[in-house]
């Protein structure tokens, strides 16, 4: 087992990893930018190293400075968290080249799954259902049109190197096709430096279902059930829950088997997530595999009782999984609300500032993952997510009621958050009944804004 780990991240995920390491008697090294010198993860770690200026490119994306910090402080491994360098194959390879362990999959696997069109081909070969679309890339309008004529409208044009909803456009007719293609291609080039594109049939009103995978370095691959991540705004998740209300035991078994096949087909190791869309007729299709720990991993921890961060560290140290698929059972229901420093009633504008006072919810079945504290000044340079409120209860309805209580207890003074919008969603009849898909926010936002006045 590792004696010391560097956490190549910031915010609540860095705090989360530090806490797991402390419970495993592993020393931790935090990195920070000059904007984060008073951050909570810096205070909690055993050691902390400044790796650059406020801009992410100068600090949290500064590969050489991060690896130098790890080597000079005597670390054996680097945990990348999520975001920043977590899915950067060059970083993963560089870490290994420098004699350290990257807590995640191999760089070549990150490459293969990061290219969405290649990942699609890999899944077809592994026997995993994929949405009808192009076999490989479409890099000219003529190639695109030829595929679309076969699969029909509507379609979704996507960047092969894409993620986070960028480099992606819908087209409902031929009139929209060329503009959608050129716009998505230009955005992909600007965001990822790669304008390789592919196209899929657009699945209308889908649910976004993902399966948590654990794969050790001894060939053992299992899944830990699913998460329903359908409550999204502009392809960014807001509320996640586990398990999914609409999945029966038979469908869960089939989708779980497909998720395991996907990981096996990719030669995957460590924690990963296989994402599917589920249509209105319960047909499911692979969309991508995320090669890192997810923001929403706590809800899987709540229903399985398995600490995913500790499992990542155990796997990276060479230990085999200590449980088998038949040992995994889902107990009760868990919901997570992402608390962002933004104003949902004014076009979700960012709202950084100083936290003048904070009170976190408590009581049975309530967990809060955050890096906030009273007096902390939120930097302007980074992601707006400041906390995750997670609840667990015996049933879904009890979990909804528990989350309402938790949100009503949460007080963060000095900055505006999306807490009120989350509270509204949890009172929407369609949400309570489980009648929602990825267009839920888009459909109900105006109504919720008008209710807020």
Predicted feature residues:
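ATP-dependent carboxylate activation and anion-phosphoryl transfer catalytic cores
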Residues: 7-23, 48, 71-73, 96, ...
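ATP-binding N-terminal substructure of ATP-dependent carboxylate-amine bond-forming enzymes
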Residues: 1-125, 138-146
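A short acidic, helix-capping loop that chelates divalent metal ions and anchors anionic groups
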Residues: 165-167
């Amino acid at each position: 087992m590792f004696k010391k780990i560097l956490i190549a991240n910031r915010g609540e995920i860095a705090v989360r990893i530090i806490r797991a390491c402390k419970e495993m008697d592993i020393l931790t090294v935090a990195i920070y930018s000059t904007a984060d010198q008073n951050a909570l993860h810096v205070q909690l770690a055993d050691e902390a190293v400044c790796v650059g200026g406020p801009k992410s490119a100068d600090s949290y994306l500064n590969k050489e400075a991060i690896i130098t910090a790890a080597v000079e402080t005597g670390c054996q491994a680097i945990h990348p968290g999520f975001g920043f360098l977590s899915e950067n194959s060059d970083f993963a390879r560089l870490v290994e080249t420098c004699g350290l362990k990257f807590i995640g999959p191999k760089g070549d696997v990150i490459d293969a799954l990061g290219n969405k069109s290649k990942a699609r081909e890999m899944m077809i070969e592994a026997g995993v259902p994929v949405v009808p679309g192009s076999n490989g890339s479409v890099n000219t309008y003529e190639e695109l049109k030829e595929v679309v004529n076969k699969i029909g409208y509507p379609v979704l044009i996507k960047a092969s190197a894409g993620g986070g909803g960028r480099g992606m456009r819908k087209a409902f007719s031929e009139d929209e096709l060329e503009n959608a293609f050129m716009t998505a291609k230009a955005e992909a080039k600007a965001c990822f430096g790669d304008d390789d594109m592919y196209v899929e049939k657009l699945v209308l009103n889908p649910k976004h279902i993902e399966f948590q995978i654990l794969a050790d370095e001894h060939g053992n691959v299992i899944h830990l059930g699913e998460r329903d991540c359908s409550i999204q705004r502009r392809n960014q998740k807001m509320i996640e829950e586990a398990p999914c209300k609409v999945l029966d035991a038979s469908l869960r078994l089939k989708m779980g088997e497909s998720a395991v096949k996907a990981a096996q087909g990719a030669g995957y190791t460590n924690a990963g997530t296989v994402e599917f869309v589920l249509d209105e007729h319960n047909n499911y299709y692979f969309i991508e595999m995320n090669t890192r720990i997810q923001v929403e991993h706590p809800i899987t921890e709540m229903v399985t009782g398995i600490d995913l961060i500790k499992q990542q560290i155990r796997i990276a140290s060479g230990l085999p999984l200590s449980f088998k698929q038949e040992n995994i059972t889902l107990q009760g229901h868990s919901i997570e609300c992402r608390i962002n420093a933004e104003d949902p009633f004014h076009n979700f504008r960012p709202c950084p500032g100083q936290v003048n006072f904070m009170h976190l919810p408590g009581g049975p079945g309530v967990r809060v993952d955050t890096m906030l504290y009273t007096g902390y000044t939120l930097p302007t340079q980074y992601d707006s997510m400041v906390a995750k409120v997670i609840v667990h209860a015996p049933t879904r309805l009890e979990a909804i009621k528990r989350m309402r209580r938790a949100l009503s207890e949460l007080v963060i003074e000095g900055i505006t958050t999306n807490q009120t919008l989350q509270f509204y969603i949890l009172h929407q009849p369609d949400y309570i009944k489980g009648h929602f898909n990825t267009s839920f926010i888009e459909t109900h936002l105006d109504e919720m804004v008008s209710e807020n006045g």
